[in-house]
Amino acid sequence: MQMITLAQQAKIASVELAQFENVQKNQALLTIAQQLEQRSAEILAANAKDIEFAKNQGISTAIIDRLLLNESRLQGIANDVRNVAKLADPVGQVIDGGVLNSGLKIERQRVPLGVILTIYEARPNVTIDVASLCLKTGNAVILRGGKETKFTNAVLVEVVQQALETAGLPKLAVQAVTDPDRVLLLELLKLDRYIDMVIPRGGAGLHQFCKENSTIPVIVGGIGVCHMFVEKSADQQKTLELIANAKTQRPSTCNTLETLLVEKAIAVEFLPKLANRMKALGVTLHTDDLQKTEGIEPLDEARMRQEWLSLDLNVVVIDNLTKAVEHIREYGSQHSEAILTSDYQLARQFVAQVDAAAVYINASTRFTDGGEFGLGAEVAVSTQKLHARGPMGLEALTTYKWVCEGDYLVRK
């Protein structure tokens, strides 16, 4: 199928979908969740094919972890869909309004964006997350997964389309591009007549490719060079446990801790404790402030600008909070940054000075997630400032229109 035909079909479906009530959209969502559970064996078998292909291609363990589905992860995806169904539908909400001096009644109402193009790599969960959020908000979506997710996505898209048909919604509101040829992607990125937003989810290369080649607005984000600053007054035992969570809970995610900044005043005391705790967890420290032994490697300045996505952690000793903020400005990706401290005034200073989508005081960066933020599933984590920032839930997939009413009112 030609890409322009695909986009035209999506545009028509988006107009139809926008007219449906919340109850019908929720019925489709609940059917999707049910089918994910009932067809789990089929989905996991398809995923096993993708995993085998990835291993044969020599794809990294971090990417394979993102690609992997198991019973637990699949159940989590189904639960996320049910949670989306429970959320209030933002479409039709009146943001604000009133009656003007002219007598004109005016309201600002939320409406769907229209057609969303999502481009992603080894993340089969994105197929369902994005489809469910777009469905809830009345948007059509074109899904372009990577070649790594070919078999898994084929089954997942089939599940979604069947659920749409069962609920009486337009099947073509969710479509997939299965051919990985980048020429086709380039065609899609030029179809601004039909597609309203592009959301890439993948590495820095994918984001740059979309920014450089798209005539459609692109949401940039998902690159998480996340920092944590251990200020001298922090509770060191609690700090070690928090670092363990932020680094090791799921290292391949974009909200994982990548660089730890330690205030110089406590470095001699704290760093040996850190080294012991991280060694026990299999984490390799990259630092010039500890003697090189097993599990400790020299610091590579270039790697401080990149995600590790693995059990590796940069450790840098910093003079004070001001220097920590300067470091984050230089090396951070405006995703998630944290301070651990007992000094509330310094914490507020950190929040005021750090430019990021999410800033934490005494909490793990792992919370930067649509589900954890109470948004349901997320389509992406935006690190830009327009049109959305941070985890993108339902409201981020809407825009608004001004609805104006008068009694044959004319402007004087």
From Swiss-Prot:
Keyword NADP: yes
Tree of life domain: Bacteria
Reactions the enzyme catalyzes: L-glutamate 5-semialdehyde + phosphate + NADP(+) = L-glutamyl 5-phosphate + NADPH + H(+)
Pathway info: Amino-acid biosynthesis; L-proline biosynthesis; L-glutamate 5-semialdehyde from L-glutamate: step 2/2
InterPro entries (alphabetical): Ald_DH/histidinol_DH (IPR016161), Ald_DH_C (IPR016163), Ald_DH_N (IPR016162), Aldehyde_DH_dom (IPR015590), Glu-5-SA_DH (IPR012134), GPR_dom (IPR000965)
CDD domains: ALDH_F18-19_ProA-GPR
NAD is among the record's keywords: no
EC number(s) per entry: 1.2.1.41
Keywords associated with the record: Amino-acid biosynthesis, Cytoplasm, NADP, Oxidoreductase, Proline biosynthesis
GO BP, sorted A to Z: L-proline biosynthetic process
Pfam name, any one: Aldedh
Disulfide bonds: none
Subcellular location: Cytoplasm
Coiled-coil ranges from the UniProt annotation: none
GO CC, alphabetical: cytoplasm
GO molecular function annotations of the record: glutamate-5-semialdehyde dehydrogenase activity; NADP binding
Family stated for the protein in its record: Belongs to the gamma-glutamyl phosphate reductase family.
Function: Catalyzes the NADPH-dependent reduction of L-glutamate 5-phosphate into L-glutamate 5-semialdehyde and phosphate. The product spontaneously undergoes cyclization to form 1-pyrroline-5-carboxylate.
Official protein name in the record: Gamma-glutamyl phosphate reductase
Gene that this sequence comes from: proA
